[in-house]
Each structure stands twice: as C-alpha cells, then as structure tokens.
C-alpha cells in the first residue's frame, strides 16, 4: 500500500533569506547597507537582513554567533537579476567593488552579466536577461 504524500501548507513562504557568514560583521553591514545601498529590513543584532528584492534577502551574520563559521572557500554566489546590467556595472565600477569582472554574455544561459567579490569573499553576480 502506497502512503499519501503530505500536503504542503497553504501558508507560502514570505521571504527567501540567504545567510552569509562574516568574520567582521561591520564590513558586511557597510557593504550591503552603505556601499550597495540595500535597506536593512530586520536587525537581529548579530545578524542584519537586507532586502534585495520584493521577497529576496541577504542575511549578514557574525560568524561567532551564527549556525556556521566563515570559511575560506565560498561555495555560495549571490545573484541579482536586474533590468539594466550596464547601469549597475557603471555604479559598481564607480564605487570600486573588489575583483570587478568585465561584462560578459552567455547565449546558452541567455544572460548578460558581471561579477565581483564582497568584503568576505562571496561572489556577487549581477545579471540581465537577454531574451
């Protein structure tokens, strides 16, 4: 006899938060809040959550208090889909983000994009659809 799969609750997720772990929390606060200018939506003291889009958030966490530690290998990429990648590239070049790539296109992925690193070494990709 086959068991019936449980039904997903009707109350959908309100936010998707990606948590990244910082050795120096203030650097993350300055970068996401001041340099990139994202609004802080939730301040939990040792974790600051920034609104990146309507339901997408980045949580910057003090590694000494969070569930994980910062690690030299950063297998997470923060990706923002924007309507005008050229305008965002100009802005990032003007503010001097670390390891700013050239703009590139991928016909396979149907994107125009560039990448840079945040102060903790996480890669941030800014992309625009080209279809």
Predicted regions and their residues:
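Conserved short beta-strand elements that form part of the metal-binding/catalytic scaffold
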Residues: 39-73, 123-128
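Vicinal oxygen chelate
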Residues: 1-11, 14-23, 51, 69-131, ...
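Conserved active-site alpha-helix within GNAT-family acetyltransferase domains
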Residues: 26-35, 114
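Short secondary-structure junctions
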Residues: 37-43, 98-103
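N-terminal beta-strand motif that seeds the catalytic metal site of vicinal oxygen chelate
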Residues: 1-29, 76-78, 130-131
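A cross-family glycoside hydrolase active-site/sugar-binding cleft signature
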Residues: 19, 61, 79, 102, ...
